[in-house]
A protein has these predicted regions:
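Catalytic Walker B motif of ABC-type/P-loop ATPase nucleotide-binding domains
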Residues: 164-167
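Conserved ABC transporter NBD signature motif
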Residues: 62-73, 81
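Conserved ABC ATPase "signature" C-loop
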Residues: 217-218
Length: 279
C-alpha cells in the first residue's frame, strides 16, 4: 500500500492583484520515501505549491494534508508542519540570515528552545555531515554560491524533516558542484527522507527521480514513474518540453540493437554508451 506524506486537495491560491490564480485546483499526493521531480514552465505554480507545503502560505480554497490529517491554521499545527517539511529556496540569500555558518545552521533549533548542549551537538553533527565544519565560524557572505546552497540545506536538515522540498537547487551550479550536491541528496534520501525537487532540467529529472509530477497553469497535469510520464509525447509537446536526450537516442536505435542491450530503459547517455560498448 502506497502511503503519502503530503497531499493537496483542490488547492486554490491567487496572489493579491493577480488576474490568474497561481494554484487552480491542485490535487496531488507525495508518496513516502520517493525521490520526486516537480516539472513545469516558469509561472506554473511550483514555488507557490512549495510555500503551501510547509505552511508559509494558506490556501484560499481546498486543503493541505500531512499524513492524511488536514493542516489547520493553529500555530502549533503550522510549527509542527515546518519541522516536518523542510524547504530550501532557489536563492540561498533568501534563507541565510545569521552572521556565520554555525549560527545560521543553529537558527531553527534555537527557535525550538532546545537545551544549548543539544543544539551544539546537532549543529556539530550536521556541519560534519555536510562538510562545513572548517567554515563553522566563517561569515556567510564570504562563501561561494555552491557553499551557500550547502549551508541552506544544512540549516533545513538539522531539523530532521521527513520531507525535503528543493526549489531549483542545481541552477547556477557548475557540473562538479551539481555532482557533489546530488551525492548529498542521495545520503539524505538513504537516511529515510522523502524529497521533492522542482527543476527545469528534464535529463536530470529522468535520471534522478523515481516519481515525477508535471504542473501547468496552476494544475497538476501528469504524475507517475519517469518512464510513463516521459512517454506522454502529446502532453510534453503542448508544454514545449524536450524529452530526455537518452530516450530520444534509445528510440533512434534499431530494434535488434535494443534487444541486445538488455531489459530496462537506460537512465543516462553515459549508461547507454556503456551498454553499447559492451555489445
Amino acid at each position: 500500500v502506497t502511503t503519502h506524506v503530503l497531499e493537496f486537495a483542490d488547492v486554490h491560491y491567487t496572489y493579491p492583484g493577480a488576474a490568474q490564480p497561481a494554484l487552480n485546483g491542485v490535487t496531488m499526493a507525495v508518496p513516502a520515501g520517493r525521490r520526486c521531480a516537480l516539472l513545469g514552465r516558469n509561472g506554473c505554480g511550483k514555488s507557490t505549491l512549495f510555500l503551501h507545503a510547509n505552511g508559509i502560505f494558506r490556501p484560499h480554497k481546498g486543503q493541505v494534508l500531512w499524513k492524511g490529517v488536514p493542516i489547520s491554521s493553529r500555530r502549533a499545527d503550522l510549527q509542527a508542519l515546518k519541522r516536518n517539511v523542510g524547504l530550501v529556496f532557489q536563492d540561498p540569500e533568501q534563507q541565510l540570515i545569521a552572521a556565520t555558518v554555525a549560527e545560521d545552521v543553529s537558527y531553527g533549533l534555537c527557535n525550538l528552545h532546545l537545551p544549548e548542549a543539544e543544539i551544539r551537538e546537532k549543529v556539530r553533527r550536521t556541519l560534519e555531515a555536510f562538510g562545513l565544519s572548517e567554515w563553522a565560524d566563517t561569515p556567510v557572505h564570504h562563501l561561494s554560491l555552491g557553499q551557500k546552497r550547502r549551508v541552506a540545506l544544512a540549516g533545513v536538515m538539522v531539523m530532521e524533516p521527513e520531507l525535503l522540498l528543493l526549489d531549483e537547487p542545481t541552477s547556477y551550479l557548475d557540473p562538479w558542484q551539481t555532482e557533489a550536491f546530488v551525492r548529498q541528496l542521495e545520503r539524505i534520501h538513504a537516511a529515510g527522507t522523502t524529497i521533492v525537487m522542482a527543476t527545469h532540467d528534464l535529463d536530470f529529472a529522468y535520471a534522478w527521480a523515481d516519481w515525477v509530477f508535471v504542473m501547468d497553469a496552476g494544475r497538476l497535469v501528469l504524475a507517475g514513474e519517469p518512464e510513463r510520464v516521459f512517454a506522454r509525447r502529446d502532453i510534453l509537446e503542448v508544454l514545449q518540453f524536450k524529452r530526455p536526450a537518452v530516450l530520444e537516442l534509445w528510440e533512434s536505435l534499431p530494434g535488434h540493437v535494443k534487444e541486445r542491450l538488455g531489459p530496462g530503459l537506460p537512465k543516462t547517455t553515459g549508461e547507454l554508451a556503456e551498454r553499447l560498448r559492451l555489445l
